[in-house]
């Protein structure tokens, strides 16, 4: 039901096992961990302190059991239409890649892939918003970075078939992605099936 991580490879092993969900709401911490760690001001993501926390602990236990529940309010920042704070999702991923280059070389491929998924996540939000015309240069830059990772994503076993279609379509054409997104909503409405597109 769970796994205990410890030792000098703690961070690498946790990340390689896929347990790098970076939100703090699904974790329990010793209070003393935050004696010297503070969340950065005006940041959208909790994730900026992820490596800092793991570098200060000697053991991490990851459980599959449900311990408590997270309630997402309608006015939660996670539900807002695109705003510039969402770009922090990319900033922390690129920071992690930079950290991997400096201290965790074995995590470079994983963090590089993580960056591509960050571009996908943010551009997916932007492509579905009314702001895409006002932020066209940003959209094009994210699209360029996504195209660099198409082969990486297609070969990955971390992305399902529908996710690969969504990623590739967004990397190639905003209109194609938007069309597939609307088609997905239509199919879901008719069949009641889950979304085929991410995000």
Positions of PLM-derived features:
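Membrane-interface aromatic/basic loop that binds lipid-linked glycans or pyrophosphate carriers
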Residues: 128-199
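Catalytic core of nucleotide-sugar-dependent glycosyltransferases
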Residues: 67-73, 79-107, 121-151
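GST superfamily/GST-like fold recognition
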Residues: 116-119
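All-alpha amphipathic helical-bundle segments outside canonical DNA-binding/catalytic cores
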Residues: 106-114
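Active-site catalytic microenvironments for nucleophilic, acid-base chemistry
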Residues: 36, 56, 99, 113, ...
């Amino acid at each position: 039901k769970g796994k205990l991580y410890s030792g000098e490879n703690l961070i690498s092993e946790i990340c390689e096992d896929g347990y790098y969900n970076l939100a703090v709401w699904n974790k329990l911490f010793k209070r003393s961990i935050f004696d010297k760690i503070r969340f950065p001001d005006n940041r959208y993501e909790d994730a900026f302190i992820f490596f800092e926390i793991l570098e200060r602990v000697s053991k991490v236990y990851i459980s599959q059991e449900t311990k408590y529940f997270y309630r997402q309010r309608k006015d939660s920042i996670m539900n807002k239409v695109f705003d510039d704070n969402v770009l922090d999702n990319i900033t922390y991923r690129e920071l992690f890649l930079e950290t991997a280059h400096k201290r965790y070389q074995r995590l470079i491929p994983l963090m590089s892939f993580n960056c591509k998924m960050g571009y996908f996540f943010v551009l997916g939000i932007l492509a579905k918003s009314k702001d895409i015309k006002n932020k066209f240069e940003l959209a094009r830059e994210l699209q360029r970075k996504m195209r660099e990772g198409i082969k990486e994503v297609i070969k990955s076993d971390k992305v399902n078939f529908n996710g690969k279609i969504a990623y590739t379509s967004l990397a190639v054409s905003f209109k194609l992605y938007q069309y597939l997104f609307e088609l997905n909503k239509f199919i879901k409405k008719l069949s009641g099936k889950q979304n085929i597109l991410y995000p």
